[in-house]
Curated annotation (Swiss-Prot):
HAMAP family linked: MoaC_A
Binding site for substrate: 75-77, 111-112
Active-site residues from the entry: 126
Organism in which the protein naturally occurs: Pyrococcus abyssi (strain GE5 / Orsay)
Xref: InterPro entries: Mo_CF_biosynth-C_arc, MoaC, MoaC_sf, MoCo_biosynth_MoaA/MoaC, Mopterin_CF_biosynth-C_dom
Protein name: Probable cyclic pyranopterin monophosphate synthase
Length: 159
């Protein structure tokens, strides 16, 4: 089915029928980065951001976003998730977020992983915007970049 649009036919847009598919283990991992000034990274590491714990807030927001993916992206199926993990790694001038989503279902969870990582990064931006703004109220350094799916797994049972 590579190259064929499954959400569109001659009648218009539709949610793809997945009733005939087998329930199998699904996992997707998405990553993305937010570029921040090194001074902001230091404040986050030291827990000195006024709004509170940046990474804990971003984790919670990302997990909630994963659960709400079908409400945000209209043609995504509601999926009974079995687990979501959001982790962070620091660089000198960035934080890389990773969102891993797992489920046993009939369709993949890559959109959920992308939604989770993106909302986690947006939440970091929101938490640090007061210290990232320049004297004109702009964000010349701050940016979200390189959001992508790094792994997608579909495992059939060997029983």
């Amino acid at each position: 089915m590579v190259g064929r649009l499954t959400h569109v036919d001659e009648k218009g847009v539709k949610m793809v029928e997945i009733g005939h598919k087998d329930v199998v283990f699904r996992k997707a991992i998405a990553k993305g980065r937010i570029r921040l000034r090194p001074e902001t990274i230091k404040l986050i590491r030291e827990g000195k951001i006024e709004k509170g714990n940046v990474l804990a807030t971003a984790q919670i927001a990302g997990i909630l976003a994963v659960k709400k993916t079908p409400e945000l992206i209209p043609l995504c199926h509601p999926i009974p998730l079995t687990g979501v993990d959001i982790t962070f790694e620091f660089g000198e001038d960035y934080i890389e977020a990773t969102c891993e989503v797992r489920a046993y279902y009939k369709t993949g969870v890559e959109m959920e992983a992308l939604t989770g990582v993106t909302v986690a990064l947006l939440t970091i931006w929101d938490m640090v915007k007061a210290v990232e703004k320049d004297e004109h109220g702009q964000y010349p350094y701050t940016r979200i970049e390189d959001v992508r799916v790094v792994e997608k797994i579909k495992t059939y049972s060997t029983q």
